[in-house]
Amino acid sequence: MATVSMRDMLKAGVHFGHQTRYWNPKMKPFIFGARNKVHIINLEKTVPMFNEALAELSKISSRKGKILFVGTKRAASEAVKEAANSCDQFFVNHRWLGGMLTNWKTVRQSIKRLKDLETQSQDGTFDKLTKKEALMRTRELEKLENSLGGIKDMGGLPDALFVIDADHEHIAIKEANNLGIPVFAIVDTNSDPDGVDFVIPGNDDAIRAVSLYLNAVAATVREGRSQDLAAQAEESFVEAE
């Protein structure tokens, strides 16, 4: 299983928190101290907590669980999309629309509209429209793709959320809490860890740190999925005997 060492974390700057004046006192157990008015995260805590989270994500994916990656701030957006795609999972990387999980029925209708528009754009329907109507539909398609493109094939609620920046994505976390969906999140020194089932104390801004988390999670999910496939192959082999 993919694991991350303290050396990897130090190189990526995982230990740099936010300025001390922005801290959330609930993060005190995970803070080592302060340097130049910036909190330093205690990696002695982060390393085992992250590896524990990876072990649990591996279990979920080995049971065919769906993982939803959430990271909508600009620094994380592209990396979140790439990581989710690399392990055939799902993502929200632009704006979290209120009710994305708790109002899944409505979201499903919007996904249907997105897929209809995709078909129309490919089967020549757009070409038969007036220029203005075609432009309006193209804009609608782009808007829906931005918001829902990463979850259009999810086919139902996810089995876990992996969140970059618990503070920024507090609405997503609250919705997952309401539905009993486990939340794995990177929690910086300015964030509230409440509502996060698997807290990973760490820098949520530096792109190197964000990439480190995402690559490790994606590799873990791929491994978990391959365990599931190996188990399936073994079962069918036994049946064939």
Curated annotation (Swiss-Prot):
A matching Pfam family: Ribosomal_S2
Similarity field: Belongs to the universal ribosomal protein uS2 family.
Entry keywords, A to Z: Ribonucleoprotein, Ribosomal protein
Disulfide links within the chain: none
GO cellular component, one term: cytosolic small ribosomal subunit
Name of the protein this chain belongs to: Small ribosomal subunit protein uS2
Organism whose genome encodes this protein: Cronobacter sakazakii (strain ATCC BAA-894) (Enterobacter sakazakii)
GO BP terms in the entry: translation
Domain of life of the organism encoding this protein: Bacteria
Gene that produces this protein: rpsB
UniProt GO MF annotations: structural constituent of ribosome
InterPro entries: Ribosomal_uS2, Ribosomal_uS2_bac/mit/plastid, Ribosomal_uS2_CS, Ribosomal_uS2_flav_dom_sf
